[in-house]
């Protein structure tokens, strides 16, 4: 039987930074909980607390509605990373 991997304990970044409210205008803070394609990452991957995850989801949805953050990112047009260049 294969050994199980041991992962480090996940912690809430927002609780550690003592953030009381996550503002939709602070896009740098929102990018901590978004994937490179612009999707909202789930709690099991980010380690956010329930309260922080709900605030993040609301803030990202508001920022998308106000066009501060894109709904989706087209990775075909981005050739900055070495990973993207290796396939073309």
UniProtKB/Swiss-Prot annotation:
UniProt cross-references to SUPFAM superfamilies, sorted A to Z: Ribosomal protein S18
Record GO biological process: translation
Stated role: Binds as a heterodimer with protein bS6 to the central domain of the 16S rRNA, where it helps stabilize the platform of the 30S subunit.
NCBIfam families the UniProt entry points to: S18 (TIGR00165)
Origin: domain of life: Bacteria
A molecular-function term among this protein's GO annotations: small ribosomal subunit rRNA binding
The organism of origin for this protein: Aliarcobacter butzleri (strain RM4018)
Protein's name in the database: Small ribosomal subunit protein bS18
HAMAP family reported for this sequence: Ribosomal_bS18 (MF_00270)
An annotated GO cellular component: cytosolic small ribosomal subunit
Similarity-based family: Belongs to the bacterial ribosomal protein bS18 family.
Protein's gene: rpsR
Annotated coiled-coil segments of the chain: none
Keywords: Ribonucleoprotein, Ribosomal protein, RNA-binding, rRNA-binding
Self-association state and partner proteins as the record states: Part of the 30S ribosomal subunit. Forms a tight heterodimer with protein bS6.
